[in-house]
Amino acid sequence: MGASASGPECSGDEPSRPINVKVNHFFHDPTLSSYTSTENIPWEGNERMILDAWVRPPFKSLKDVLAPTPGARPSVKRSPLVSGYERPQSMVQKSVDLFLQEMDEAGVDKGILVGRQAGHRVVSNDDIAELRDQYPQRFPLSIAGINGADVPAALREVERTITKMGFNGIAVDPGWWVPAMYVDDPRIYPIYAKCQEHGVVMYLTCSLMQGPDISYAEPWRIQRVANDFPSLQIVVVHGAFPYTSEMIGVMIANAPLGNLWVLPDFFQSIPGFPGAQDWVEAANHYLGDRILYASSYPVRPLKQSLLEFQRFSYKPDVLENLLSKNAANLFRMKV
């Protein structure tokens, strides 16, 4: 298992072959970033491969990832975040075998395991590595969760997970740390610098839920980090909702650097959610090589998420990019 963003090599039954993906010329300038072209990435014979860029199967410490915050107000049925939610049996029974079965039923070929260490929400990176190693064909990529509230400890964990455990990236939730931090807080910068040094991907979670108030999702702060660390590939998880238009603007402004990606996940796939169609228009016209598909399981079920995502009117080549090829490009995968 490789320890950089180049990702692992996973053998398949069919020989790999080069593909040429249509990349919007607004972003396509190989002199600016090694991530701006998806040409000649070895790919399996299955053109319709689906890679879910954010999953947390029910395995050991991942089983409790949705545990409620102590002292938090109870969830309410009228919340759009639970609109039409179909609780998957794999989550009910806490079964990895059922999760793999649900992957097959949904047509999801591979998933990226994503950790989290924020407040009481702690997923063991050792558990993620164990699950990844048990099912390397299903989970070829892994992202380690890091708690930046203790920077020296966080830097040690970055070093351990990347250099010794073969993780492909780091996930941070600054708004959920104790104390909460904005993404451009200077205290976090050593973590960004360490990730940039190792050439791994940064999953940066920003939305109305991550932080004491929605100011913790402000896209201009994300833009500042991207500018300050131009070689750090940053995936904005949840798309900085509710600042959808502003986030799209930041993505456009980031074109010369080409180091920002976005993962709108359930904030887009929930039917009728505000701003969802904006991502479709952006993908179809100028961000088709910058958006990743993810269910964010267990927040939304695998099959339900995919069906809700596919109901949008994406151009066929754009849909293919979002469902797998953009993630392959980001991680420079050989699958």
Feature map (PLM): residue ranges:
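Catalytic pocket-lining loop regions of alpha/beta-barrel enzymes
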Residues: F27, M165-G169, P174-L292
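Mid-to-C-terminal alpha-helical segments outside catalytic/metal-binding sites
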Residues: C10, H25-A53, K60-K110, R160, ...
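Active-site mouth loops of central-metabolism enzymes
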Residues: V82-Q93, L141-P152, M181-Y182
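Active-site-adjacent beta->alpha loops and helix N-cap segments on the catalytic face
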Residues: V122-D126, A153, A180-I188
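Divalent metal-coordination and catalytic microenvironments
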Residues: W54, M103, I128, S142, ...
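Histidine-centered divalent metal-coordination motifs
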Residues: W54-K60, T205, H238
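Polybasic, low-complexity intrinsically disordered segments
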Residues: G2-V23
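Short, well-structured secondary-structure segments
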Residues: L100-E102, G107-V123, D127-L131, P136-I146
